């Protein structure tokens, strides 16, 4: 990446692609050329990696059962494109419910979030995907794809740093318009997207509007903001794509509304201030509860920084990632707002987030009496 900072104006896109891949390798991804993968161009999974991971982490499954599970994931696209994306994402995070030959249903994990080294991390370039256009076979070839256990979790589109006419907007159009139109079967497995021209590097989802793709300006909380050309790329790779960090973001910081609202096609990934805020708030709350200090802490967020989503990410952390802390257990979370605008904003988000929060019912209380009734009627859970 250092040599990119001194490029002489004659860089081509392929050289930037090679440098980007090399940097991903430096943080733990293993390179594999797309043309070296034994597959049909209509297939978008790396079968060998998928089956190897299942054999390692679910050794009780027979080879033919692993094959059956692979086919379940491979043939996932029966609903709308967005509903399929949402369904597959839930499989990746929660596992797939599968019934082996013994007849006892089990959840089979597709990714090991607790032990990252059990996963197979691949960075793949020039991965050709075939589609039919007016009866003719044609192909698309995304610049870079990140595979975990044979599944393409993130698509990265790069533009030439030396070409003033090649912009990250073009990269965004390539993903959100052309790829969805021509090769949706690939994007069914790709919740995340990254666009970069070297100077600007932005993170979003495959459904994110262009204006909501954002830079990731810190690797760790407290770091100096990265603002120089090519620093954005380095910070993005180290701050988002280091494998352990990538799994953390992928598991808890990608937001989908409840399945019944899939028609809205809403998918959001956190911005870096939301990620670090939710992390620090969780740590502070856990410390306060365990030590019984009553000092949870205060978080200041500027107008428009996405505080409501920060609270959603925090609530998910408290609900799902504190199971080993008996003092927290299955918490009941109360969110108090001081403006009608925030009340409406909160209702709009949280009422459609039962699956994301995993806390059960989401209620809106009108006054203290109503709140006492709500709290008195439950021993745990609820928002």
Residue ranges and their predicted role:
Residues 2-333, 337, 341-360, 378-383:
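ATP-dependent helicase/translocase motor core
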Residues 360-366:
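Extended, non-catalytic scaffold segments that flank or surround catalytic motifs
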Residues 367-383:
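Conserved motor-coupling elements within RecA-like helicase/translocase cores
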